[in-house]
Every structure is written in structure tokens, then in C-alpha cells.
Amino acid sequence: MMKKYTNFVAIDVETTGLNDDSEIIEVGLAIVEDGAVVRTWQSLVRPEKPIPKDIAIMTGISNEMVADAPAWSEIEDEFLQVIDGHWLLAHNYLFDKGRVEFQLGRSLPNDWLDSHDMAKLFLPTLSSYKLVSIATHLHIPDTNHHRALNDAVVCAQVFLKLMDDAKQLDPFVLHEMAVTYNGQQESLFANSSCSLGDLLFRLAEAATASAPALDSLDFFEPSYADPYEMPRLRFANAEAFFAQDGILAKMKPDFQYRAPQVDMLDCIKQAFATDKHALIEAGTGTGKSFAYLVPALLWSFEHDARVVIATGTINLQEQLFHTDLPFLKEALGHPFATAIAKGRSNYLCLRRFSEYCRRASTASERERVFATSLVLWHAQDHSGDREHLNLNKAENQYWQNIASAPDTCLGRRCPFYNECCYFNSKRQCEQARVVITNHSLLFQDLKIGSLLPEYDRVIIDEAHHLEDEATHQFTDTVDFELMQKLLNNFSRNGGFLGRVTVALGKADTLAENSTEIAERANRAMTDTVDAAKTIGGTITFANNIPELSNIGDLRITDKIRNSGWWLTLEESLRKSHRAVTTAVTSIRRLLNSLDEDENIESLLREMTHAHDRLAEQRDWLERFIAGIDDSFVYWAKTYKNFSYANLLLNAAYIDIMPLVHEKLFEAKKTAILTSATLAVNKDLNYTANKFLLEPGEYLSSINESPFDYEHHSLIAIPNDHKDYSKTSDFEYTRNVISDLKALIPAVDGDMLVLFTSYAMLNKVQQALKDEPSLNGYRILAHGQDGSRSSLLEALQDGEKTVLLGANSFWEGVDVKGASLRTVVIAKLPFTPPTMPVESARNDLLKSQGKNAFTANSLPQAVLRFRQGCGRLIRSNSDRGCIIILDNRVLTKSYGRTFLDSLPKQPVWTDSVATLADKLKKWHNEP
């Protein structure tokens, strides 16, 4: 029965682009018989339009190569003969199918299967589903990526390997996958054509029972520490772990003693022993993670006390838990009790997932693949943690249907309670003595409690983000899209009201209440939309949002509240508030009237949660309208292509630090704040003052990077442009373009250019792509050419690349070696003073008689600048240059603050042309 799936043709096409009218420039076919590639067919194709530069760079197919190639019409008949009578395989088949049928001018009768979908199903945790990534994972050679014949052969080999591996899975799991995908039984597919659904049933038939059955697997396997097994070290002599002849040296052949690492550990030891807080800057290469994990583990064991470690990013959280902690447990000779804590929505709800699988067959093809892939994932990984999955944008939306959520949770009454992924995670955290979490969950716990187990010592890594995260977590946001969704659930027959009526069979009893609630919910929806449109239109007009701007923010100041036009906005908001209040009251009355019938227990929880969220939105809207709390800044936010659905009304603390000090530093015995960038001009006073820390309550330590910056790095600053303050945005952008055109060939690519705005980034990319002298370089842009991770992969794939990045690219980019040899700072990263929170904080500082620029704007920019420059040297062997195109570091009195905050290294200042010559020679030095 499997034979028909071992005879097929794999196809790949290279094209002039990704648009609907893109032309094929190469086609490759791999003919498979009895599970082996028996012959191939390939041809270049001459397109009617020229091949774009970026396509030529990616594929290696130039206009010269296809000049004498046949047109599609000349190879069409032979192509059709080769594929005749076969089903076709491609990677992301809709693209190849679409391009071929576009060239043919008609549809093909052949069945199609997708190797991408097969990989999604059987490799659900793969980090990338590019063909080359799948091939690498399966140990299949891929010698000429982005050439059609090579990719067709690799595609065939990937499919065959996945099919062979699938046969070794538990037949029960395969059968569950088939039923989830199809929603039908095998007999209906006995004579079907080739399809993914049919293939799943055939694989279940052919599978051997080599894996344990799904229901025999343990869902919860906590890691308990043996209390009688002592670690190899005591807390008091933890620094011995890093000694020249210590434990780490014996376990790592490339070990190098780092004095800054030991200094950092000593500071943490003192803070723990004396119940003090600490501010610790640890430069790149210090070994920061081990420096705080070792004392945390030993302290938690010896004192039977919990230590929480919070990171700014999920990536670091995962690294600590899945890489660093297992290594240290082995090194220290003790299975310390550790756990990872994440937000509830990160975990799979088994009850919702079970229901989702039963109805998945009626969903779209993409959603069916998603649901089916999770059947295998959960059979192999019972943590239910979505971080182990690689979800795209659409799949993230699907996940919301199966994620653990308070509004749908039945608690102990749930039939899956004992296996619950979320509660198992909570139980592990309660048993653990070292808990790894993230800033977001840390502050949610500080705000509402009960999310993390009790603790009195915390280590916060990536602490330069702490103020922003605290501000975000304590911001109240009126979300008009959310209000519409909540109201919509009560406004239609298919929503909550209809489901209650069906479940209880009390149509007559509920009819009157249902009609009243539906009418009031509809009225609230109408009034809310009207209010959103009124405010959104005003913001757009007031800010005159530029064509390339993404966000429009309007700070609602006292001056605006006293203006005539505000009265119109306020009345519109009040009308919406009254309508929502009326709807909330009616919903509450209905909830009070419903008995706790077990038939609607889950539904009642959903309705109650929706009511509570709607009431919360109503209360926040009331606060926003009143605007009487001077400790808050109020603003409205909308996005490009405004609609009522993307309007947000926000209220945030102007100065969040008193609350942070109360919730964190006053409540905990020890809070360690660490980062590569806490100091300004090699001084921690700015950070200490920001967090309201008094000299006697904290320790401090600045641990410089052990890397040799003086010999491996330099700073280049062009000095042949006008003073920045005398330059328009248009002229400055033109200067950046001109400078990059000269500098990119000089350093031969391998460059990251950091921007503070997408508007400038987009203009620069277009100009560089149009520059003939840069034809040999791939110019990629954040927001234009793929996700952050895919762009970083491209930077390291060996091609000469210039990556233009904004926002997130200023930090967290860890590219070692020759793939990144130049970092360019296009503009100093000052936060725009018109941003609502920044504006309000500056106003507060001015009212206190302080200089807002030196007290706030400058130090924040310096820390951001240091983060950006820190992308360059990531290892002892790295070598490269930092180019600063913003001449304010030379012309302004505060410019030295930026330069003096960097590690000591040569600084070159000259014309762009001269710098280009010097950098070319320097890069070519051994």
C-alpha cells in the first residue's frame, strides 16, 4: 500500500522573484522509483525580464547564464512528458505549483505533496523548516543550495527519509495523527489519490511498534535532588570552581581563567551573605551566567532557600535551563532541584487540545497540519511548552485555541488535571530551589502574586531592560479590539448566549435576558467603534503621520484636555463608557441567574472571565477619561492604516521606580541586577540613583570584558560632513547612503548597520540596492527581507552581506567570527523626546529643577549605544571595526561620554574616503 508513495517526481524551480508574475529561470526534476532517485532532468530558462541582482546573488544564476537558455515554451513539452502520470513533491509546493501553472497558463492534473508539511508533522520541534535546515538535521548532503536540480534531489531525499523514520513511530500515535488530520477512518481513503491524509493512514499500517504506546508514557517526571548527595563545593569557597586547576578547568579543554568572572562571583557571595542588593556590570566574555548560577545553586542547597533568576529574553532563559544548569549539575556533582517558570499561555491545555483535534479536519490545510503535528509533539514531549515548537505567525494564532488560560481552566475538576502541563510546571517550581523565569513573569508576580513560588533572593540578568519592563507591566491599556471581541461574544446567537441556551435547553427562560444582553452588547460595540474612529482620526490629523511612519502617539496633556476639540473626544468616550457599563451590568445579572450546572461549567468560566475583562476595560477607560492622577502619563496610540481595531488608550506611571523599589528591593533580602551595560562613563551611580538605591543597601562591581579590544577592534568616525544640528533629515540620510557606498566595499561586507528609525532604514536599503558598485553584496533589511532569526542566519551563511537593522538588532545579536566584522552606528540612539513616556519623564525632571537631557536622555542613549557596539567582538578571536556616522560624538560636548563608555581601543577620525582606504588595509592585515 506504501508503494505509490515511493514513486514520484520531486520538483524545484528558481524564479525572478516571489511575486505572482515572477518567471522561472531554472527548473529541476528528480524522478523517484521504488524509493530511490533513478534519474534527473534540469534546464535553465530564459525569462522575458532581467534577473534582479538579489536573485542572482542568492541563486548564482546571472542574466549572462540564461541569455542563450531556452524559453519556457521550448522546454514545456519535455517537462510535461517527464512528470506525466506521477504525483509531484515540492518544498512549500504552492509556490512551485503556482509558478509552473503560471508558465503553462493552465492547471496541472497531478497530485502534489509538500516536504515542508511532512517535516512539520514529523519534526515538530525543528528550529527552521527551510529545506537546507531539514536536510542538515537528517544528515542529507546539500551541496548547491538554491539551484533547482540540487534542491529537487534533496527534497526527494528528505521526503523518503521522513517516511522511513515515521514507520518507526508508535502506530497508535500515527493513527491519532491520521484521524486528527482527516477526521475520518481509513476505509474512506482506500482508493483515494495521493494525499497527506492517505499517507498518514498508510504509515500507521506500515509502522512497527518500536516506540512505547502514548498512554504508557509518564506525563510528569519531576527532577528531585538527592538530599544525601553533597555538592563538590561549598558556597564559602565557590570561587574554587573557576580556579586555574578547578572543576571548570578540568571539564572544559578550552578553559581560560577570567578574573572578572571571579570578581563578579565574589560580589554576589557578599550580597547573599549580608542581605544586600548588588549592581554588577559584566562585559562581553566575562562568563556572567556561570558567575551567578554557581553561587545561586550552592546557596540554595546549603540554606534550603529558593533563588529566582530572571532574564530579559526567552532565549537566555532557555539557555540557562537547558544548557548551563545541566552542565553545572554534572560539574558540581549534585542534581540540584531546578525549574523553569513561564507565563500560562506558553503551555498546552490538554482538554482544549483534545477538543481541537476532534474538529481539526474541518479547518484549513495549514491548521490541520498544525494540529496533527502537535499530536506527535505531545507524545514525545509532555512539557507542553510552546517554546519547543517553531511556530509561524498563523500558528501562533492557532495556539491561542489550545493554550492554557484562566477563563477556560476547570482546575481539579478537569479530567486532565493530573497530567496538566501548566500545573505540572507550577508543581516543579514549588519543589525547585532555583527557578529560572523572565522579566515579564517576574513583574506580573510582583504585581498580582501567586505566579511564582515564595522567594527572597533574585538575580536579574539583562537588567538594563528593567525599567521598560516594569513600566509595561504596570501600564493600564484600553484595547478597543479586545473590547469588540469581548462584546461580540455576547451579541450573537453563536456566541456565549446561544451556547448556554443549547447546553441548558432553556430557550424560553433565557430568551428575554439574551435579547436584552445582545442588544446592549451591540449598542456598546457601535458606540465603541464610533469613539475609536473619532480618536483615531484626531491622532492621525494631529500627528500628521508620515507615509513611512508605523505608529502615531498622542500624549493627552492638561493642555489638550482644556482644548475645545477634546470635549468632542471626551463625550464620544463617555458615550462608549456608558454603553459598556450597561452591557456589563446585564451580563453580570445573567451570570448571577445561572445555576452552576456541570453542563456549562467550562462555558460559565469563560463567560465570567470575559465579563471580568470587559469590566476591567471599562474601569481603565473611566480612569483615562478622568485623567486626574498626576503620577500617570496618558496617551493614545494607533498604527499605520488606522482602523478602530488598532486603537489603544494607555495610562502608565511617569516614575515607576518608587513602585519597583517597594515591590522588589524592599520586599526581597537580595536583588542582584546584572548586565553588560549598566554603567555610564564607567560609573554605576546613574543606575543606582534610578533604582533609588542608597549607598549602604547595595554593593557594586564593574567587570570589564577580558577581550583585547586595543588590538582586535577600532572605532572609525567620518568628519567631513556638516554638524548634525545643521543638517536636515533628508540631507543626513543622503550622507549615510553616501558613506555606506564608500565603506561597504572597503570592509568587503559582513556588516551590520544599526538604525533608530525604519524610515531611514528603508530609504538607505533602496539606495544601496540600486547602486551598481554594490552588485556583489546582498543588502538585507529588518522588516523587509524576513524574520530576525532568518536574517541572522543569512548574515552567517558565507555570502557577502550587509544587514540593516533597527530596534531589536541593537542587542542580542551574537555572531562570532568573520561573518560580522563591521558594526555601523547610523545615528546615536536617543529616544525621541516626543514619545509620551519619555516626554512625561523629562517634564517631571524639569519640574524638579534637573536637566532632563543629562539626567535621562543622555545616559539612556549611552547604554543603548554600548549595546549596539557590543555586537562586534563576541569572542577572543574576533576582529573588526565600529563605524560611527553620527558626528555628534565629535562636535558635541557630550560626545566624549559615548566614546569613553566603550572599551579602550584606537579611534580613527578622518574623511570617509581616507577612512575607507585605511579600513581596507586594516581588514586585509593578518
Question: Which residues fall in each region the model found?
Answer:
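A contiguous, basic/glycine-rich beta-loop/short-helix subdomain that forms a polymer-engagement track
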Residues: Q400-R433, H439, L446-G449, H577-H721, ...
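Signature of the SF2 helicase/ATPase Hel1-core->accessory helical subdomain module
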Residues: Y292, L298, E318, P326, ...
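Conserved non-catalytic scaffold segment of RNase H-like nuclease domains
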Residues: M2-W112, P124-H146
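A substrate-engagement module of RecA-like helicase motors
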Residues: F219-A225, F235-G246, D304-R433, G495, ...
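Acidic two-metal-ion nuclease catalytic site recognized across multiple nuclease folds
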Residues: M2-K3, L160-A240
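Conserved pre-motif I regulatory segment
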Residues: R232-L279
